Amino acid sequence: QFPIHKASPKAGGDYPFQFVSCHARWSIHSTWRDTPMMLRLQRGEPQVWINQIDATKIGVKDFEYAEIYNNYGSIRMRIKVSTMVRPGVAYYYHAWEPHQFPNHESYKWLIPGIVNPILMAGGYGQINHAMNRYQPGSAVQDTRVGIKPWHGQETKTYPVEKNPDATNI
């Protein structure tokens, strides 16, 4: 019997865009990600790259804000329109810190993660639960998202209930 290809499940829901990430180009992991010199190399804030065809369909232009969302949550990022991105792909560089997003959001809110039971133990310094602890640094390549224009209305959602006692949000 020959092996057959089976499509991967669409993590995050049945949305039109594949959320793809790669290593940050202008930092060493998240180190120096928010220094003025490095920010000048990359428009100064988180951005998601999409194809011109997709941008036209959605109704967004280069450098406008858009809402990126799926079943896990929603965030806002600036759009970077590029012909280098394949249609149907939303591409971003990882390692942006939540304080660099509007309203302290994070791209990690859209990424499924596996719960590590050790993180459920509390009160031990480095072992504590806070937002974004369950998600990996980069998107699983099967993560799906939708994108729509954002014109200033509030879209803030939390993927899990906000913990007022968490210190690392």
Which role fits each region the language model picked out?
Residues Q1-P36:
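Long, low-complexity segments enriched in small/aliphatic residues
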Residues S30, T35-W49, I53-I169:
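Long, contiguous, secondary-structure-rich segments that constitute the structural scaffold
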